[in-house]
């Protein structure tokens, strides 16, 4: 049995539970208990505060955990990064009142900064030879300048709407963060085998996230040019049609290049282009 620690609420909780669901792992409700066992996979889920997850994994109370990179770096616990998961992305930034003229990071010299991430902040300030008074608070960091507690803040930024609603502006992006799968350094061989199975499922889901399955009818006269346009995993699938002048072409495309490639396909005479999402992809 492998024990995974995950955040008990919030955006990372939702993203993590969605990932586990997409891997086919069934997890019961967490509303009444902190530890839930899967009904179809050797996994039990331990629900914790996000800032407790790194230590819980490092100490071996949990074997692995899914946690924000910001918390992992801040806690500096002795655990391995098993995989970057690419979701729950945010950044940790310095922000100050909108009305303030900001010349650069030297503005913070002698100022007070409120934050829940003092260790990351101290490293950044030391790298930039800036001396400040760091005021550590947990939660509602964004209100600190408005109530006179600090001159600026160092906090998580996602959309930036919280800063705007508190009359603040982002002036320095210090760190980019995403969800990480972290692991204890001393897993048994049995638990490593379960983790490998879990990783196989997770990677199959993540790889498919930005891919589209595309089918089209293509004129055989332009088939060579169409095949060159399609990146594909290896080469596209070509299927004959009743009309000998045409064939059906199937391929997998990266979503970020999708519209550019579709435009080229249409210019080469492709018709009836059908696009479907991919739930999982096993390479």
Sequence positions of predicted segments:
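Small-molecule-sensing regulatory modules
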Residues: 1-43, 69-80, 84-91, 99-283
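Active-site-flanking structural segment that lines cofactor/substrate pockets
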Residues: 37-55
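Pocket-flanking alpha-helical
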Residues: 51-56, 61-78
């Amino acid at each position: 049995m492998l024990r995974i620690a995950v955040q008990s609420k919030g955006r990372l909780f939702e993203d993590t539970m969605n990932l586990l669901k997409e891997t086919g792992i069934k997890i019961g409700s967490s509303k009444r208990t902190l530890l839930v066992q899967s009904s179809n996979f050797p996994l039990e889920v331990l629900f914790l505060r996000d800032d407790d997850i790194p230590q819980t994994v490092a100490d071996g109370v949990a074997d692995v955990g899914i946690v924000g990179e910001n918390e992992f770096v801040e806690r500096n616990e002795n655990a391995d990064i098993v995989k970057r998961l690419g979701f729950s992305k945010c950044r940790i930034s310095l922000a100050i009142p909108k009305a303030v003229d900001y010349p650069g990071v030297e503005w913070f010299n002698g100022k007070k900064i409120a934050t829940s991430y003092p260790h990351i902040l101290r490293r950044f300030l030391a790298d930039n030879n800036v001396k400040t008074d760091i005021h550590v608070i947990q939660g509602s960091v964004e209100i600190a300048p408005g109530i006179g507690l600090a001159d600026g803040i160092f906090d998580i930024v996602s959309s930036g709407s919280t800063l705007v609603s508190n009359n603040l502006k982002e002036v320095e992006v210090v760190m980019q963060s995403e969800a990480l799968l972290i692991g204890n350094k001393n897993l048994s061989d049995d638990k490593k085998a379960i983790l490998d199975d879990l990783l196989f499922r997770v990677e199959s889901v993540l790889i498919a996230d930005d891919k589209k399955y595309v089918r089209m009818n293509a004129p055989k006269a332009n088939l060579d040019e169409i095949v060159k346009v399609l990146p594909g995993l290896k080469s596209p699938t070509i299927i004959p049609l009743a009309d000998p002048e045409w064939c059906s072409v199937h391929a997998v495309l990266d979503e970020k290049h999708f519209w550019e490639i579709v435009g080229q396909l249409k210019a080469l005479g492709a018709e009836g282009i059908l696009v479907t999402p991919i739930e999982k992809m096993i390479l």
